[in-house]
Design a protein with these regions (language model features):
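Post-transcriptional modification and biogenesis factors for structured RNAs
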Residues: 1-146
Length: 146
């Protein structure tokens, strides 16, 4: 399975890149990981760039402040179902300062909220990476999540 994280905006901060790199390396033990950073801009241009970055027959997760709040174990079950159903790519969409275009969010298989609080998109990317790693470790029965 492939995991593709598509984020509007760049994570330039060296410390953030280091933390992301650590979690991305951990995720790579379980799935091929790809991160795509898209330039922010006009809403219609962002929507088009995002849509072009989503492979056909992907399972799409839109990170939304008003999305569904689920725990780590339920998220692991969701990801496990995608694996069991031989989904080729699970795509995670992270919007910029103004969120995701509505038309893409509505088409997502899961609208996911990482927190009841609004997170900066760069921090949301780090939280997401940790939760993806945690989900895979739960699915494999590894001791990371206790």
């Amino acid at each position: 399975m492939r995991v593709r994280i598509i984020a509007v905006g760049k994570a330039k901060d060296r410390d953030l890149r280091s933390l992301l790199g650590d979690y991305y390396a951990r995720i790579e033990r379980y799935a091929k990981l790809e991160e795509i950073e898209l330039k922010d801009g006009k809403a219609d241009e962002v929507a088009e760039r995002l849509a072009r970055s989503i492979p056909d027959r992907s399972r799409v997760v839109a990170l939304e402040v008003d999305g569904r709040a689920i725990g780590s174990r339920d998220f692991a079950k969701w990801l496990g179902r995608a694996e069991n159903e031989s989904v080729q790519t699970v795509v995670f969409l992270i919007g910029g300062a103004y969120g995701l275009p509505q038309e893409l969010s509505k088409k997502a298989d899961l609208r996911l909220s990482l927190s009841a609080m609004t997170l900066p998109h760069r921090l949301a990317r780090l939280f997401l990476a940790e939760q993806i790693y945690r989900a895979f470790s739960i699915l494999r029965g590894e001791p990371y999540d206790h």
